[in-house]
């Protein structure tokens, strides 16, 4: 089924990424610290992996079954525009410096597009930024001020996957907003767990990172502010240690 999908998983610090289905082909765009890392691994090369074919399908199965990812279809953006934005970023990126821990997929399909910062420039902020740039209105909110009775327009901003997942889950259950639909079960039907992956358990490092990212998201998912909005808290700590 053609469409644009946001994936979220919340094991440890979690992860968020985007995939596009177009003309029976799968395109996955996943950003993270997949290469060189700075102190405590909280910063590093910001690498965008662009996966297709068997790479993309295996990544789907890993996310669905190892990390219990959830999938949300976003109906108010086009496959063409979403692909154009991500592939423009990827095409303008640089080949990463290989590291011992770097995965094969990243060596083959990764490009450095910027500097990663857990609190400021991460998988969640990139996912939201690109989908917003592609034209979605799902992150636009408004409310009536109790003091002025005027309508206040706002934009939701997210730093951590758990906040994004919570927001998309609420949106998918809101019948007045038909532009977000959870499709996790249909993806599990289409992509069986042929490797018999077991769910990953959380690690201590992941819990520490989750706490840091949580603190950077300031007042919460509906505040309109995140570490990305206010510049992050680790911006000066990027110094490659490999």
Language-model segments: which ranges?
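Active-site cores enriched in adjacent His and Asp/Glu residues with nearby glycine-rich loops
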Residues: 145
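Solvent-exposed, polar/charged alpha-helical surfaces in well-ordered, non-transmembrane soluble domains
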Residues: 125-129
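Long, low-complexity, intrinsically disordered segments
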Residues: 229-242
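Non-catalytic ligand/cofactor/substrate-binding and regulatory segments of enzyme domains
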Residues: 1-121, 133, 149-220, 224, ...
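Substrate-binding/catalytic groove segments of enzymes
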Residues: 132-142
């Amino acid at each position: 089924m053609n469409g644009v999908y946001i994936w979220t998983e919340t094991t440890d610090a979690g992860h968020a990424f985007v995939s596009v289905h177009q003309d029976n082909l799968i395109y996955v765009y996943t950003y993270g610290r997949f290469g060189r890392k700075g102190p405590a691994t909280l910063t590093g090369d910001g690498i965008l992996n662009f996966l297709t074919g068997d790479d993309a399908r295996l990544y789907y199965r890993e996310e669905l079954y190892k990390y219990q990812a959830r999938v949300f279809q976003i109906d108010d953006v086009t496959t063409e525009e979403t692909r154009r934005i991500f592939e423009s970023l990827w095409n303008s990126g640089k080949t990463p410096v290989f590291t011992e821990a770097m995965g094969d997929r990243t060596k083959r399909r990764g490009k450095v597009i910027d500097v990663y910062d857990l609190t400021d420039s991460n998988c969640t902020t990139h996912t939201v930024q690109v989908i917003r740039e592609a034209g979605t209105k799902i992150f636009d909110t408004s409310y009536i001020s109790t003091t002025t009775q005027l309508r206040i327009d706002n934009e939701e901003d997210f730093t951590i996957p758990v906040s994004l997942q919570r927001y998309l889950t609420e949106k998918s259950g809101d019948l007045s907003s038909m532009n977000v639909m959870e499709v996790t079960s249909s993806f599990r039907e289409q992509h069986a767990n042929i490797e018999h992956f077991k769910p990953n358990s959380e690690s201590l490092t992941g819990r520490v990172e989750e706490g840091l990212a949580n603190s950077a998201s300031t007042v919460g998912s509906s505040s309109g502010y995140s570490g990305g909005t206010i510049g992050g808290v680790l911006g000066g700590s990027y110094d490659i240690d490999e």
